[in-house]
Amino acid sequence: MASLNSSNEIKSYQFKQMAFNKTTGGKKAKKIGVFCKPKAPSATDILGRLIPWLRKQNYHVFLDEGTAAIINETSSHEKKEIFQQADLLIALGGDGTLLSVARVAHPHNIPILAVNLGSLGFLAEISIDELYPTLENILAGKFEIENRMLLNACIWRNGEKVEDHNVLNDVVINKGAVARVINLQVLVNGQYMTSYRADGLIIATPTGSTAYSLSAGGPIIHPSMHTLVLSPICPFTLTNRSILIPDQSVIQVKLAAEYDDVRVTLDGQEGYDMRAGDILEIKKTKTSLQLIRGPNKNYYQVLRNKLHWGTQNDEDIL
């Protein structure tokens, strides 16, 4: 289990206990779980080439039901079984595909290779053209892991925990389309911080700082930083700005009054009702996500490419 102080470190990674080398004779083949966005461009062609290629390398491939259906495979596995068995996960799609896999896979400490099939892809930074050279390096044990922080979010209602989930990007509290400004009381480590009157509040990891939080005026945070960011959405008080707090903090957000429609959204994919008096408690998980880095890429290169920042010729750079 990763320590609380090492959740974002970049490190070289070798499959030690897994001995992720080709097997021969009667030895058991190593196991790779593959997940693909069903409506991704060219998903059928990509899987139709990838799966036979992996099997030819003598690796056992696990497909979930949705992925198997894309290429009409009759054999599929439950996601729980894949996470328990696999030595490596491949997520084909975009950031959304990775987020859905990561929330469940991270306690199992399985490295994930995220491949971008056409979307923005801050996290899924590996292109389809880079897939096979990257896989060859991975299967030879030559790659780097970037550990990404996750958050645990619980909703407490009348002293009882009614929801308990993990997120990679962010936890968002927001009002419905016709609801008025909501009042959110925020405590950090049991100490009262402030009350927000706003359309909502975003609590994001460094990974999530380039998602919804960025649109709300929050800062971009390097993944190695041990911090969380709280960003109010359209606050009534203009001095209510984004604030960074240590990642070992425990954040409690209380919905101070009754509103018609207030939701807690996790990574933009799952939503739950929040009622008057409910307390949303957020803290860092003990385990982190093991994300395989793209070849010859760094964080600033990804920012330049995805945010269309200005570039210079190599000879002009100091």
Each predicted region: which residue ranges?
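ATP/NTP phosphate-donor binding region
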Residues: 2-4, 8-88, 129-144, 155-165, ...
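Redox-cofactor binding/interface segments in oxidoreductases and associated redox assembly factors
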Residues: 34, 91, 203
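Short glycine/serine/threonine-rich phosphate/pyrophosphate-binding segments
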Residues: 43-44, 96-101, 210-214
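Short, well-ordered beta-strand core segments
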Residues: 89, 112, 201-202
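Gly/Ser-rich helix-loop-strand patches that form or flank binding pockets
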Residues: 100, 105-115, 122
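Catalytic core of DAGKc-family lipid kinases
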Residues: 120-199
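ATP/nucleoside-binding phosphotransfer catalytic cores, i.e., glycine-rich phosphate-binding loops
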Residues: 173, 189-192, 238-318
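Gly/Ser/Thr-rich active-site loops/lids in small-molecule metabolic enzymes
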Residues: 194-198, 202-239
